[in-house]
Regions:
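Catalytic toxin/effector domains delivered as secreted proteins or via bacterial secretion systems
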Residues: 1-122
Length: 122
């Protein structure tokens, strides 16, 4: 039998622990801080380390600059869609789901709801 045990979650960055994985700011830490948002309370996803390192914002300054520009211009829906599209375009490191959007579906939904509240678009 192939058993898989995951403990994914979403919450404010300082409120969730990595639990053997990593915490991924749904909107990158740099883009948030450059635009005056708290990175400690910004919603993040607890995810597998390999998945985190495969996200668009991980170590990719061009991606982060695009995020920051969208935030600066208050293009919040476009920013959130960019994050969802990135998850959809990335493969699951475990090969169980087709992509990260499916693997972290509930966590993405949680982040979207919280970021819509934060940005005043809920």
């Amino acid at each position: 039998n192939n058993y898989y045990r995951y403990n994914f979650g979403a919450g404010a960055f300082d409120d969730i622990t990595p639990n053997g994985g990593e915490r991924h700011h749904f909107v990158s830490q740099s883009a948030l801080s450059e635009n005056g948002y708290s990175t400690k309370t910004a919603y993040s996803i607890r995810m597998m380390t390999a998945d985190h390192r495969n996200t668009g914002s991980y170590g990719n300054q061009n991606y982060v600059k695009q995020e920051s520009a969208l935030l600066k211009n208050r293009q919040y829906e476009d920013l959130l869609q960019k994050e969802v599209n990135d998850f959809k375009a990335k493969r699951d490191c475990d090969g169980i789901e087709r992509n990260l959007q499916l693997k972290y579906h509930m966590e993405i939904i949680t982040c979207l709801v919280e970021y819509e509240k934060l940005f005043g678009i809920a």
